[in-house]
Amino acid sequence: AQVPSLVAGVLAAPAGGERQAAERAVVAVCTKNPGHPEAARAFLDSFKSATAADQEALLSVLGAIGGAGALTIVDELIASPDAAKRAFGLKAISRWPDATVAPRLVELVGKARDQAERDLLLGALIRIAPLPDNKLDDAKKLELVKQTLALCSADAERTRLLERASAIRTFETFQFVVPFLEQPALAAPACKSVVELAHHQKLRDAHKPEFLAALDKVIATTEDAELVERATRYKEGKTWERKK
């Protein structure tokens, strides 16, 4: 009985902080609280019986709850011959909160019917590939980043992905990013990622010669004064405080 009233609370709440608080309450009941598997099923039942407009409003909750049941609903929408339902399903999967849907996104990018679908799905992959996620270890996340890079066809897409790659704080990520310092079109995001990785002193100190060489390259390459300052400080073993 609790879930339908919580769902009604989400739909009644004005956009903004109140709506977000209502959404968090539903997600907590359906993912963490005692009896959450039954609550998640109750939410899916509420979602299925909701109007199209209400389903649209509940999309982010559906994605945040995730799981096989939610993905089944989304896959049914994507497979629908109704173009509006397919678009709705693609929007839902593109909002998924973690990388569990990555293989499905890769598959869907390959089957995209037009550029808009491809852009939506690839954008979702670029967003989730490096996300902190307890369902994928760092090596698998980096593999997903590499797989996503292979799907990118524009430097703007590659730039977004390279900038985000530094969220995977490993030496293997550093080794993946460094060669892009030599590519003029992608040197800027590579500089940013190298510096972000160098921010982590343990990682930097464990591979000092490699980081020193890469930071020298950043200083010689970037036109961003803040990156030059940071790279210089990290080379000297100093810290850097992010400006508030």
Write out the residue ranges for each language-model feature.
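Amphipathic alpha-helical scaffolding segments comprising HEAT/armadillo-like alpha-solenoid repeats
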Residues: A1-A12, N33-K48, E56, G67-A79, ...
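Core register positions within helices of long alpha-helical scaffolds
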Residues: G9, A25-K32, V61-A64, A68, ...
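Short inter-helical turns and helix N-cap capping residues of alpha-solenoid HEAT/ARM repeat scaffolds
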Residues: P14-A15, A50-T51, P81-D82, R113-D114, ...
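Beta-propeller blade termini and top-face loops
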Residues: P14-P34, E38, K48-A57, A64, ...
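Alpha-helical protein-protein interaction modules
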Residues: A124, P184, A190-V194, K202-L203
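Long beta-sheet-rich domains in secretory-pathway and surface-associated proteins
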Residues: C152-A154, I168-F171, P189, Q201, ...
